[in-house]
């Protein structure tokens, strides 16, 4: 691997109702970046917060000698869309993403930069000694396993957003216009060299997780339908197997009636209903998956923007011009 120079680092952090953690987040992130001996910027993207997060970001961005850029979206679009909005305004050679809840310490940023300087396109992270609930750990393992099976890329922790991307990887992602985007996976599809490093994981000190059970279920559907068309192929296989089982069962009922009498076939009427319900259930599952794919095709065909930037504030300029993508 040839070492590629990094002259400027951009840190992109999506923010949604994080007013309690913002002062500590900005202080620690700025201190970590100051250790790099490189030029840097910190882009905080307000994802339609209903608290005072947006006002706090604007005040921080307007402060003298501030490295903070506030990107304000007009409403809530979701974590990954907010990050993509931040990507559209970065100017660094290396772009680092970080969650605003401080569970992944900003102090890990210099290690990501050091690893990226070895020539890697993408530097992922694996959370050590995770401070999440048992349910979150189980759900995370299931999602990671699903992604690894679907993509064939054995990255250990896709759920950790503390990651570093070379600028050409970010530019490649910005050229993708699908509505459902999962950034770590999308980045890996363009990466020639990718690696992972272990990072610390802390308990959440402020507020609650923005991922509810329903959010995790929606994320699972997003992953299934934006990663691969394997479920569609699997439906064909399952449908064929069920059809063969139904045909074989019909032959069995005919044989029982011919050789053992009508009572043998008649006594199994409730079994027939049970099998019928199984088949109907399988059809509804298949129709649901097909509906997910068709719905995503519909959204892509409409070509509506993934986000709408209402305002960008920095020490150099304050732009109120709307930008969509």
UniProtKB/Swiss-Prot annotation:
EC annotation from Swiss-Prot or TrEMBL: 2.4.2.53
Pathway(s) per entry: Glycolipid biosynthesis; 4-amino-4-deoxy-alpha-L-arabinose undecaprenyl phosphate biosynthesis; 4-amino-4-deoxy-alpha-L-arabinose undecaprenyl phosphate from UDP-4-deoxy-4-formamido-beta-L-arabinose and undecaprenyl phosphate: step 1/2; Bacterial outer membrane biogenesis; lipopolysaccharide biosynthesis
Enzyme class: transferase
Segments passing through the bilayer: 234-254, 269-289
Pfam families documented for this protein: Glycos_transf_2 (PF00535)
Membrane topology per record: Multi-pass membrane protein
Classification via InterPro entries: ArnC_tfrase, Glyco_trans_2-like, Glycosyltransferase_2, Nucleotide-diphossugar_trans
Major location (coarse): membrane
Alphabetical UniProt keywords: Antibiotic resistance, Cell inner membrane, Cell membrane, Glycosyltransferase, Lipid A biosynthesis, Lipid biosynthesis, Lipid metabolism, Lipopolysaccharide biosynthesis, Membrane, Transferase, Transmembrane, Transmembrane helix
GO MF entry, a single one: undecaprenyl-phosphate 4-deoxy-4-formamido-L-arabinose transferase activity
GO biological process, one term: lipopolysaccharide biosynthetic process
Catalytic activity: UDP-4-deoxy-4-formamido-beta-L-arabinose + di-trans,octa-cis-undecaprenyl phosphate = 4-deoxy-4-formamido-alpha-L-arabinopyranosyl di-trans,octa-cis-undecaprenyl phosphate + UDP
Family listed: Belongs to the glycosyltransferase 2 family.
Alphabetized PANTHER family for the sequence: UNDECAPRENYL-PHOSPHATE 4-DEOXY-4-FORMAMIDO-L-ARABINOSE TRANSFERASE, UNDECAPRENYL-PHOSPHATE 4-DEOXY-4-FORMAMIDO-L-ARABINOSE TRANSFERASE-RELATED
Protein role: Catalyzes the transfer of 4-deoxy-4-formamido-L-arabinose from UDP to undecaprenyl phosphate. The modified arabinose is attached to lipid A and is required for resistance to polymyxin and cationic antimicrobial peptides.
Protein name as catalogued: Undecaprenyl-phosphate 4-deoxy-4-formamido-L-arabinose transferase
Organism name: Erwinia tasmaniensis (strain DSM 17950 / CFBP 7177 / CIP 109463 / NCPPB 4357 / Et1/99)
Upper classification of the organism: Bacteria, Pseudomonadati, Pseudomonadota, Gammaproteobacteria, Enterobacterales
Gene label: arnC
């Amino acid at each position: 691997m040839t070492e590629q120079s990094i002259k400027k680092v951009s840190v992109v952090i999506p923010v949604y109702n994080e007013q309690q953690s913002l002062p500590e987040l900005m202080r620690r992130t700025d201190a970590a970046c100051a250790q790099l001996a490189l030029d840097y910027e910190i882009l905080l993207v307000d994802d339609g917060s209903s608290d005072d997060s947006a006002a706090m970001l604007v005040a921080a961005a307007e402060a003298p000698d501030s490295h903070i850029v506030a990107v304000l979206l007009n409403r809530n679009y979701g974590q990954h869309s907010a990050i993509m909005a931040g990507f559209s305004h970065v100017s660094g050679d290396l772009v680092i993403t970080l969650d605003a809840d401080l569970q992944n310490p900003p102090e890990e940023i210099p290690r990501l930069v050091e690893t990226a300087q070895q020539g890697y396109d993408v530097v992922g992270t694996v959370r050590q000694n995770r401070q999440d609930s048992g349910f979150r750990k189980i759900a995370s393992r299931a999602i990671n396993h699903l992604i690894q099976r679907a993509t064939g890329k054995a990255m250990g922790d896709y759920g950790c957003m503390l990651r570093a991307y070379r600028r050409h990887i970010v530019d490649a992602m910005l050229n993708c216009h699908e509505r459902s985007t999962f950034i770590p996976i999308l980045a890996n599809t363009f990466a020639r060299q990718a690696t992972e490093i272990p990072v610390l994981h802390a308990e959440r000190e402020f507020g609650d997780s923005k991922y509810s059970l329903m959010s995790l279920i929606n994320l699972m559907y997003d992953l299934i339908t934006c990663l691969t068309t394997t479920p569609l192929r699997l439906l064909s296989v399952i449908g064929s197997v069920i059809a063969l089982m139904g045909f074989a069962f019909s032959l069995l009922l005919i044989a029982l009636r011919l050789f053992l009498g009508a009572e043998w076939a008649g006594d199994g009427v409730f079994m027939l209903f049970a099998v019928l319900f199984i088949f109907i259930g399988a059809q509804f599952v298949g129709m649901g998956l097909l509906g997910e794919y068709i719905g995503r095709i519909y959204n892509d065909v409409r070509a509506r923007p993934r986000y709408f930037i209402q305002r960008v504030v920095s020490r150099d300029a304050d732009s109120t011009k709307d930008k969509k993508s």
